[in-house]
Amino acid sequence: MGLAARTGRFFFTEVPVADHFPLKLVGSRMLAPSVRHLEFARDDGQALDFIAGQFIQVHFNNPDGSPTKRSYSLATQHDHAFGVNDTVEIAVSFVPGGAASALFTALDEGQQIQCSGPYGRFCLNDKDQNARYLLIGTGTGVTPYRAMLPQLKQMMDTRGVEVVLLFGSRTEEDLIYREDFYAFAAENPKFRFMPCFSREVPANATADARRGYVQEQLAELVPNGAHDIAYLCGNPNMVDASFEALKEFGLSVHHIRREKYVSSK
């Protein structure tokens, strides 16, 4: 069961965990050379409400018939309780030879997958009194941050919180949902989008682009345990390194919220 507090249009919401339910593919597009954005409609007449930051599990069988599952953060932006006609979105990384990759490669529009959820507590909390959020992610680990944008906007508008998103990527084409983050930054002065490239910084990059790994940029932001709360999502090595660095800057463990993405075939 997921539980999170929301203010204004975001209410105290309890999202029940259902048994397996069908999701029907209604659309897809490539976000990066190896990442696909998939849009689904729940196909049993029920709504799939969730709290930004939560994930679903996809259940399927391996080639040998044994059951398995994969977890995917929900990417959909919403500021209302979901209805039966609302769709949900996920971002799927394709791994050569992966069982889940084979499942999604073969999935055509109109076909179903079996899912459960939503699960997870990697969510924003309106009881926070911080002055700034540091959102740190790599790869598809920025998916929950996309879902959080409406709630972050409300927090920026109502209590003036500042938000910095550090997004680690090899190249610009690997920056999934970059159009959403660039547009959100342009519309909201309190939101700063800092793409961090492990390879060369593109010639047309914004002034906030950086060269190197996300954890190497933390010193520039001068994290402060008195007013910062950090979220870490993505590669386990990045999460661990950033966690240790943030503790050294004085953030308490309570103010560092983590979710690791482990690639599974």
Give the residues covered by each predicted segment.
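A short, basic/flexible loop-to-alpha-helix module at the beginning of a structural domain
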Residues: P118-D128
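Short helix-loop-beta connector
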Residues: D126-A131, N224-H227
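Ferredoxin-reductase
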Residues: L3-E109, S198
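Reductase modules of NAD(P)H-dependent flavoproteins
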Residues: G2-L3, G8-F10, P16-P22, V163-K265
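Ser/Thr-glycine-rich phosphate-binding loops at phosphate-binding pockets of nucleotides
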Residues: T138-T143
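Histidine-anchored nucleotide/phosphate-binding helix
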Residues: P144-M156
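Conserved beta-strand elements of the Class I
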Residues: R132-I136, Y231
